[in-house]
């Protein structure tokens, strides 16, 4: 008998699939014919209706399984064997019949074979019309059934079948599975050319399928729960069998006869047949036994046995589907609310993890059984009288419907609430309450009608949340408060309530949850918030009476054992630290070593502390380990023990006497103190007073994970950030730990080197892996196995160390840190983008008077200081972090921990985990990061509560190779993510739509391919960051932006490539001001007046990148006033007219880049008068007028730090002595006309760097003169000069050997950085800081020798 998966062999047929697929189709239809042929051989098939009925009855008595095969598509093993034999014969007759063109031939051969078989039972039928005769017989038989078949009584109804197996629930479920499996075939086949195609719509067939599945669920539920006498269940199981068998007959009645195709039965007849079934034409299955009575009977049995029933999770038997079984028809108007509740129960059960439901299983069963009793009882009542009142119904049923509905309501609400809560992340951003409060105000204004009945509750909630804002501020600003754990727990509860409020309000607006449920839910939220506030106030009152000394007596001291083992690696570091300990300043000095966990800080410090050449220079040596939680007394006792020996009597002394005793012990002597594992500045404050400074070169070694602690403790020496191991050091450590004094076998060295490299240069990881290898056989196969499994093993073992650092993170930093798990391995992360994402995710808690971006930068610096994030690039001008990354160990931790916390799930393109496999664990995550489109499609049905969808791809070119089908697919599935706040598609593929239905969206980044943006984009009224990148980036086509964009008042960052606005003047005059907009790129202005209008509408702009095109000649020249907040301005020319038609005035501008313009000294001088705070000036592709000179007078750029000239046609730079008093960097790229760098640069004391790239020899010479003066005369040891020259050297030879020799000779010259060979044009391109005359001399010699 067919199971669910067996229907695959009946899938749609395609001519291109070949003969094999066509033979399968023939097999399906012909086997159906063969079934009836065998029946005719027994004399059972005739045109008489009663005879056919008897056939069905007899077949059922003989073999129920075989009867099922008569009505459905399944093929018995016997018939399959016959067909295989037939195929073997046919192949032997026609071996070449494997081609696609053989389809007609096979059809004809099989038909003739069938006709021959039929002729043996009907000799009077000729060979030509035999097949048509039997086809006609079957067709007429179907006609009689269609006209007269009333779904008659069967032997099962009279209990005449004694086979106990037919009454077993397993048999019933298997039979229903078979029918469902074969019905699925008909639904899926939609190719009219297929021989199995059923014409007409499939909606009713699908409804029949649903009814069968629900019946199967009910059977399963009853079999799991009911322990009543057997006869009760026998009646129910018999009924289930009969319903399924009737469906098999319905299927056969509308299945096409072979050869008739669509002409056998028109769609209307099919629809009527199915409608008859759906309208319950089966009125009874036995005289006096109502169909509903069967259900009522079995439900009553269930109700009486529920307390003793097996405690089996409801979802395992499909009970969430059971309440709606066959209830569409017969529900009275009064019961519509009940049906709505049961549907909500069903829909939410599938989102509820087992652990959250287990406690309520028996209550759930009871509620569902009660609901079923109500439903099936109403069937009978409706049939009797349509106008019965609710009182009449209550009296007829013997119970009170409103009272019976209340437990159902309570259970529905409980399941809905728990289903939502179970999917919330356990890590939250403190900024979520800020977002909710803003939205509550907006929602009440936009949807006042929908929310009218909740007005009072929403106002109370808003007031309560606002009153909690000061507490959330304390959580951020005082992360080490004594009540840290309590505060964080309360903060978590508050944010979870904010999530619930958002969900309930949205459900109310969209009519997704009934009003009674919403009101109950909001009242519960108000009550819970009140309890949270009371808890906070109570604990804070207690705290006011307590001392605020943090953690001094909370635990015993964790001592660090003395370590004398040989250290491997860090030889250069050790030597440097040794010099600092023995030499340097006469006063006390603190040698601070900081770095991420596992680098070996403690090992290194102990190595120095135990170095005899070091220790011998000090009078007293003592050490202590502070740890995260410490006892001040235990620290003092440990130090005294090392300094003067053990004395138990000291334990009785108070802390201040112990501290004074230790201070006096050190006072006259030179001491070396090791203070290990300091976590906070306060811990150092507690100890530093014990270490007197008497100018005798005493030293303190301090280790910490945090840069801020190391910097805080430093006195003279700068903190040492301990680097990671090099590859050579990694291998040496691994070899030492595994082999001791021996050497590694040559056979193992290659795999050993690979393992050492895979450890990520982290000493701790290397030691852990060495421990694994030490316990294994020294065989290549064993080591290869370790190498193959290294990623998971090493990271799992080292997780405890990272976990400790994570555990002590302040509450507000945990979500920021875990969010790194969304990024790809070994990728540099743009900090501006990261901060915008953090803000959009509500990780950043607002603070009055401070920008969210500034606060977020502080969060990042905190993570960097804790060595959890590595800086890869800082800005030259202000030192801000521009790019960062995570070590792989930390990144893996973020991914794993984020998944555990239900916070973020990263799904790779080849990941086997699908939402269906975790439907009862973590059905939804707050954030999903995908690497493939297929992943998103699989998860789209599980994304209703997902807050972020981020695409990451390992192929940087993927976005440009994506097909439009992806864009179409994602446009259909994105509405499923209704609570989406971040959608980052930038690195995946381009789209041709804007998802304007995502009302909560705050961050949208994508690549687009169209020429315009729809005006409906303003529907995204929560949008704060909009980044659209043009896939036509090579063409610089202008994008038309709708006027409605300027109505999006929450926008903070708007980045659209080269856009212009419809009817700019009218728009900008009438639109609102965008007070929150801080960065804008790249508007395209045709007129200066339009730019002025735009600037007036964006009064708080901080960064602007725009293109200017002036259509007037001569241009109207005046001062353009930019916002006083503007700090970065980049102007690009976008037409042939090169003059900037305005003078730039921006009093707080720090960064200015001009590209493509024609400038002169006067313009730059007048502009400089308005830019007194300018720190960075970049001129790119600029033409200078006035004899190609730029004259800069005194005090024109008083704050300028960086001056960069690229492709500037400037011959002479005339600079006054005090023109650039604070300049730090001068960069000249491809300024080929420039004659020299002015000599006044020699006297700029702040100058640190000059870079000359592809400029004249005179410029290089003047740069060297400046270097000489700066270094030798001014003692500016920090000055650096970089010379990059490019020389093009032609050659005539085509001899590759000679070219190679010349290449090697040139590369050996001093200062050569790289050489490129262009064989087609026969030239060398030489780059480096080389002596051009020397290069030419060498080239001349090569030519003379015939080598070039």
From Swiss-Prot:
One of its GO terms (cellular component) is cytoplasm. Residues 552-848 form the NB-ARC domain. Keywords: ATP-binding, Coiled coil, Cytoplasm, Hypersensitive response, Leucine-rich repeat, Membrane, Nucleotide-binding, Plant defense, Repeat. ATP binds at residues 595-602. It is found in: Cytoplasm; Membrane. Residues 1284-1348 form the HMA domain. It is a peripheral membrane protein. Pfam families: NB-ARC, NB-LRR, WH_DRP. GO terms for biological process: plant-type hypersensitive response. Signal peptide: none annotated. This protein is encoded by the haplotype B genome of the allohexaploid Solanum demissum. Belongs to the disease resistance NB-LRR family. Confers resistance to late blight (Phytophthora infestans) races carrying the avirulence gene Avr1. Resistance proteins guard the plant against pathogens that contain an appropriate avirulence protein via an indirect interaction with this avirulence protein. That triggers a defense system including the hypersensitive response, which restricts the pathogen growth. This is Putative late blight resistance protein homolog R1B-12. The gene is R1B-12.
